[in-house]
Regions:
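A metal-dependent hydrolase metal-coordination microenvironment
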Residues: 1-89, 130, 137
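Domain-core and long-helix interface of multi-subunit machines
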Residues: 1-2, 65-185, 211
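Aromatic "clamp/platform" in nucleotide-sugar-dependent glycosyltransferases that forms part
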Residues: 684
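Nucleotide-activated donor-binding/catalytic signature segment of Leloir-type glycosyltransferases, i.e.
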Residues: 647-667
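Conserved acidic donor-binding segment of nucleotide-sugar-dependent glycosyltransferases
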Residues: 716-717, 721-728, 737-742
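Short alpha-helical donor nucleotide-sugar binding micro-motif in glycosyltransferases
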Residues: 664, 671-676
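Short hydrophobic beta-strand element within catalytic cores of glycosyltransferases
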Residues: 701-704
Length: 787
């Protein structure tokens, strides 16, 4: 795509003494510059291993047209090409030696390449710093002993007498005309291009200059689009995708980006739009408006104007952030408007908005493709490192495990949030290398040192969960961060937007995943909607999402069995044991005055804490209370918490011994537990039930349903009772028995505290952090394949 003369002039302006244009299978670029003595004839071609067709790219220098033609005639057999290049004494280099172009490249192929070739591209502007540095370190680590070993194994004659001493070069790997001369090869000062090549043959070249990045790779694609646009090839239809592509490609034109160019690009898009339509659609108007708004909201030092034309790294980073804002904001607005239409029953209005999300997301394709392309070598690098371990001295990776934990909920009143905060506190004390990644409004962001919040583009209300919001995270920003951090493991607590991004990144970067099945979403959906079809659809999503994980953790054996019944692989299912703060939740926090402001004195107090919502089955406990005269005379029921079902219960005008203290936290929550006498938790959908464990630690016997995970927290008949979830009479009788027998209540209270004492957070964290479930899961996969 790049004009040879323009490429030559740019390289000279950037300080290059000699220049080689490595066109694919052609010397046409060189032919147009042959009059310049500092230009080296060169080309790049793709060779193949004849045994399996695995492709390998090779750059050849100093050749003529006849030699090129002969080489191309042999390229189906890499071995024959190698022999021809040696016979013709042509300087040649393996390009991007660890890039698995079609997924076939393996450590076996790399060992063959090491024997066959003496020169390798160790720094490429088309590869990331991580890849380049490993390539260089690997080549530097080669030894005679290693070559003896692989030569005996492969029976290949090395290219030279000292094959462990490899020549290394750097190259721009540019195909859009922007990165020329930013990566190069240095050699001792010489007078002619021929002498320079001779220095490289003698392995005296040193790669230098910038490394590539996924952002630069994506923008290269857009820059090619800019050149197509300038050539009138870019399609001209007036739709959302075309408009945004037009804006991006205009911003990525080869000229120096200025404030006027940014404004001009947006204006060109508007003019193009009005030429194509008499009246632009609402979506197109929104796209342009959001683009302009996003740019105006950028701080001045983050805008595109005023950047030196050679400072492409700064420009690329700023444009990436801008594209992230634009795409995220427009997507959020469309999704939010669609949700509002659906809530109003206007399905016909909402569906086109949802459909419009697809072309907008496709504009991200160059970014997503680049994330994939530039990270495909991670698996090969891991395999190669494992193969030479103990043979070659490569830079040691830190033995300290680095983990990213993802959750869509971190500050809400639920077990997931509470668990994450407790785990983060233990991680701080133990100095574990853990980051908990979330996306919530900055006003609600957690402040702990282990939390990393990416402010969302917006938030969407969840039906029947007015107190909770579904965040729309900045996808590109999160993925770029994850790429840069090289985490050893991902842990995913929720299958929401943040969890989906984490799973996507895990597949891109080859990171193992542990996913925790915290919430029984299918049953929640059925209870909220009454629609069994939606419940089945939710199960399909759960199987798909958790099926992508390497290991899945269930909070209880009950839910492990349920997941198996719904098609989950039993060998990939593990139990996730949580803990509690035994000092914080403690009987000593009992305060006889705590419930007095609510009119409760001298009664046996039944306590519920948590979210007050329909799926918690609280009406069973309320009805049981209302149907028993002894309970109304001697007991009280305190429903502590907030939620959409609270107002419905209050509206029933319940008797005064049923009270609603509202939402409490911190020390007040500890007192709310300890100041009660019995804990009730009738939910049939909770996968675990943190509040049950907290109540047990506070010295309260617990009444729980026979469905869900909480029944596994108590010792039935000792620290509490397990009751049929929807049997009001069974709950009434159990509650009455505890009111009428102080001895039974006190005995169960002591057993509850003793039961909880075995489950502190430090133990729970260490067990989970140190567990390695992957060998077991991999073993099962191998067993299935063999069988």
């Amino acid at each position: 795509m790049t004009d040879p003369l323009a490429a030559y002039q740019l390289a000279k302006r950037r300080g290059m003494d000699f220049i080689a244009l490595t066109d694919s299978d052609s010397l046409d670029g060189y032919a147009q510059l042959a009059q310049f003595a500092d230009v080296i004839p060169a080309c790049e071609t793709t060779l193949q291993f004849p045994e399996d067709g695995c492709p390998v790219r090779v750059m050849v220098y100093g050749l003529n047209d006849a030699q090129l033609a002969k080489m191309l005639s042999l390229r189906g057999n890499l071995y024959n090409v190698r022999e021809y290049l040696l016979a013709e004494n042509l300087y040649h280099v393996v390009a991007q030696p660890l890039e698995p172009h079609d997924g076939k490249l393996s450590p076996d192929h790399v060992e063959r390449l090491l024997l066959l070739f003496d020169h390798f591209e160790a720094r490429s502007c088309g590869r990331q710093q991580r890849s380049n540095e490993f390539t260089s370190a690997f080549l530097d680590a080669l030894t005679p002993e290693y070559f003896d070993q692989i030569q005996r194994k492969l029976k290949i004659t090395p290219a030279s007498e000292r094959p462990w001493q490899k020549g290394q070069i750097g190259s721009s790997n540019d195909y859009c005309g922007q990165y020329i001369g930013l990566t190069w090869t240095e050699a001792p000062r010489v007078a002619t291009a021929g002498e320079f090549l001779q220095q490289l043959r003698m392995r005296k070249g040193t790669p230098a200059g910038m490394h590539g990045s996924t952002i630069a790779s994506a923008h290269s694609m857009y820059r090619v689009g800019a050149q197509l646009y300038a050539s009138k090839v870019l399609r001209r239809e007036g739709d959302v995708q075309g408009i945004l592509e037009l804006i991006l490609t205009r911003l990525l034109s080869p000229e120096k980006p200025t404030k006027m160019q940014v404004a001009g690009s947006l204006w060109d898009a508007l003019k193009n739009l009005f030429k194509m339509r008499k009246k632009p659609s609402a979506i197109e108007r929104k796209l342009i408006a959001e683009t302009i708004r996003a740019y105006r909201e950028l701080p001045k030092d983050e805008r595109l104007g005023g950047i030196d034309r050679d400072d492409l790294q700064t420009f690329d980073a700023r444009l990436y952030n801008m594209a992230d804002r634009v795409l995220s904001k427009v997507s959020y607005q469309l999704l939010n408007d669609a949700m509002k239409d659906f809530e109003r029953g206007q399905i016909g209005s909402g569906l086109p908005l949802v459909a419009a999300l697809l072309p907008i997301q496709s504009v991200m394709a160059p970014y997503l493709y680049s994330f994939d392309k530039l990270n495909r070598d991670r698996k090969l690098i891991r395999e190669l490192s494992a193969r030479v371990e103990g043979t070659l001295e490569l830079p040691k990776k830190s033995a300290r495990k680095k983990v990213a934990w993802f959750s869509d909920t971190v500050t809400d009143v639920n077990g997931v949030s509470m668990t994450l905060h407790r785990m983060s506190e233990v991680a701080e004390k133990l100095d574990a290398d853990l980051e908990i990644i979330c996306s919530v409004a900055e006003s609600r962001a957690p402040t702990g040192s282990k939390f990393l919040n990416f402010p969302p583009v917006g938030e969407i209300s969840i039906p029947d969960y007015e107190l909770q919001k579904l965040s729309v995270p900045p996808i590109l920003r999160i993925v770029k961060y994850l790429e840069s951090q090289n985490f050893d493991e991902y842990i995913i607590s929720t299958p929401g937007p943040v969890g989906l991004i984490a799973m996507f990144a895990a597949k891109l970067f080859g990171v193992p995943v542990r996913a925790i099945y915290h919430s029984d979403f299918p049953q929640h959906v059925r209870q909220i909607t009454g629609d069994e079809g939606l419940e089945k659809t939710t199960w399909k999503f759960m199987r798909w999402f958790y099926g992508l994980a390497d290991a899945v953790y269930s909070p209880s054996d009950h839910y492990r069995k349920q997941l198996i019944d719904h098609g989950f692989n039993p060998r990939r299912l593990f139990i996730y044991t949580r803990g509690t703060d035994l000092d914080f939740y403690n009987p000593r926090h009992r305060d006889e005055e705590f419930y007095k402001p609510h009119g409760i004195t001298d009664r046996v107090i039944f306590v519920y804490t948590g979210r007050v919502s329909r799926e918690k089955n609280l009406d069973v406990v309320v009805d049981a209370f209302l149907q028993d005269e002894v309970l109304q005379r001697k007991a009280a029921l305190a429903i502590v918490g907030d939620g959409p079902f609270r107002d419905e219960l209050i509206a029933r005008k319940l008797p005064p011994m049923i009270v609603f203290p509202g939402f409490v936290k911190g020390k007040q929550l500890a007192k709310a537990y300890a100041s009660g006498d019995v804990f009730v938790f009738p939910s049939t959908t909770d996968t675990y039930g943190n509040s049950v464990l907290e109540a047990q630690a506070s010295g309260l016997p617990s009444l729980v349903s026979n469905e869900g995970g909480p029944k596994e927290i108590i010792l039935p008949g000792e620290s509490g009772l397990v009751l049929p979830g929807y049997d009001v009479n069974a709950w009434r009788q159990a509650m009455r028995s505890l009111v009428e027998s102080d001895d039974l209540r006190h005995r169960m209270a002591a057993a509850a505290r003793a039961r909880a004492a075995t489950r502190d957070w430090s133990t729970a964290f260490r067990e989970f952090w140190d567990e390695d479930p992957y060998p077991k899961a991999d073993e099962e996969v191998r067993a299935i394949v063999i069988a």
